[in-house]
Amino acid sequence: DTKNGLSKDLTVFENLKTWSEMKGWKTSDDDLQRALDSVDMLNHKNLYVSQCSEGLKKRAALSRLYLSLLFDVEFWLLDEPTNELDQKGIILFNKLIQRFLENKGTVLLACHELKLFDFNYELLNLDLLKR
């Protein structure tokens, strides 16, 4: 699933573990399970990505944000992070964002639905210049 950076031939858990290893992060199975739990995916950890709905795939991808809270990540660049998420997924995503901001992280995200976010933000309007 190139849209979310997930391998359809691996389980949700295996995807997260592989991604963490590729980053060079030393994470325990408990860390990975907490990451999945942060986006309400723990009960789906043994599902193959090919069996997941688009919303579950998005949640699986967003679980990586939780892992970045455990390391010295200072910046998140996110493109339409709430696409395919249901209301519960958006609430869980907001909690991750809020926690990251409280830890002095910076988030740059592209989104058409700013009303979905329940945290303080600075809006930058980047209009294209016409010649």
Question: Model features per residue range: what roles?
Answer:
Residues 3, 8-25, 31:
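Q-loop/switch helix immediately C-terminal to the Walker
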Residues 10, 52, 66-69:
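ABC ATPase signature
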Residues 17, 29-44:
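Conserved ABC ATPase "signature" region
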Residues 48-57:
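Conserved ABC ATPase signature
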Residues 57-69:
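ABC ATPase nucleotide-binding domain "signature" region
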Residues 74-80, 85:
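Catalytic Walker B motif of ABC-type/P-loop ATPase nucleotide-binding domains
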Residues 86-95:
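Conserved D-loop/post-Walker B switch-helix segment of ABC ATPase nucleotide-binding domains
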Residues 109-113:
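H-loop/switch region of ABC-family ATPase nucleotide-binding domains
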